[in-house]
């Protein structure tokens, strides 16, 4: 897969196609992230960690970095095969589309 389009980059494209193009093809030209926006990103990360506390004892399928999302797909499949029932940052691929979940939980009814 050549390119990854997350929810936030998809929204960026809906808001401004030029912004999406620059972000995906000329990333080094983008303006630095303002501290106020970085605080919003950090808050989102904190919410994710708090959500994990609602489902303790899970395993983390996060990739080493966000440019290695297929690593997360492999970890997710390994965890499912090994019988894990709570997977943080579970990621799946179908037809070159990646879908990442904050928390995947298996209960008596299934996933």
Question: What is the predicted function of each stretch?
Answer:
Residues 1-110:
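Metal-dependent nuclease catalytic cores that hydrolyze phosphodiester bonds in DNA/RNA
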């Amino acid at each position: 897969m050549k390119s990854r389009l997350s929810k936030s980059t998809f929204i960026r494209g809906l808001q401004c196609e030029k912004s999406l193009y620059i972000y995906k093809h000329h990333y080094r030209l983008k303006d630095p992230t303002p501290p106020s926006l970085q605080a919003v990103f950090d808050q989102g990360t904190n919410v994710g960690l708090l959500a994990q506390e609602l489902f303790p004892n899970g395993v983390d399928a996060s990739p080493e970095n966000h440019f290695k999302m297929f690593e997360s797909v492999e970890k997710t499949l390994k965890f499912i095969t090994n019988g894990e029932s709570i997977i943080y940052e579970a990621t799946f691929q179908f037809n070159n589309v990646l879908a990442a979940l904050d928390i995947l939980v298996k209960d008596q009814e299934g996933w």
